Amino acid sequence: MPREKGRKVVASNRKARHDYSILDTYEAGMALTGTEVKSLRAGRASLVDAFAQERNGELYLHGMHIPEYVQGTWTNHEPRRTRKLLLNRIEIDRLIGKTRESGLTIVPLQVYFSDGWAKVEIGVAKGKKSYDKRQDLAKRDAQREIARAAGRRGKGMAD
């Protein structure tokens, strides 16, 4: 069977972009079992409350939920197990160095298949304060109103 091409998004962490300001992003592979891959291909995953953490010089993804594969038997995986992230040593060292700074953490942003391989997009993030979140919402609403008004003007409708 030929390998699929392109990028197929399985799950995205929209809350991460709301709660954190993303400073830098990386693409990492994941060490998965067979039933985890089958469950991901079925589009079943959740990144809510997931984060990456350093242990013994490696990065691990905690809290990501991949439900058990429906047709799986005794070989099924544990849904919230810790999964190893596959990165180059230079990238791992750079990420570990950044997380040692105060207030920075690593959060997963998306899980997707890239040319048949399961990947996770991780971001180095700094937590937002509540007033930052309110400002972002106000900016987004203002942009939406501007776009709506421009659309009406383009269609010849009066405000």
Curated annotation (Swiss-Prot):
Coiled coil: none
Gene3D superfamilies: 2.40.280.10
InterPro entries assigned to the protein according to its UniProt record, in alphabetical order: SmpB, SsrA-bd_prot, SsrA-bd_prot_CS
Protein name, per record: SsrA-binding protein
One term of GO molecular function: RNA binding
Organism: Salinispora tropica (strain ATCC BAA-916 / DSM 44818 / JCM 13857 / NBRC 105044 / CNB-440)
Gene Ontology BP, a term: trans-translation
SUPFAM superfamilies in alphabetical order: Small protein B (SmpB) (SSF74982)
Main location group: cytoplasm
Gene assigned in the entry: smpB
Subcellular location: Cytoplasm
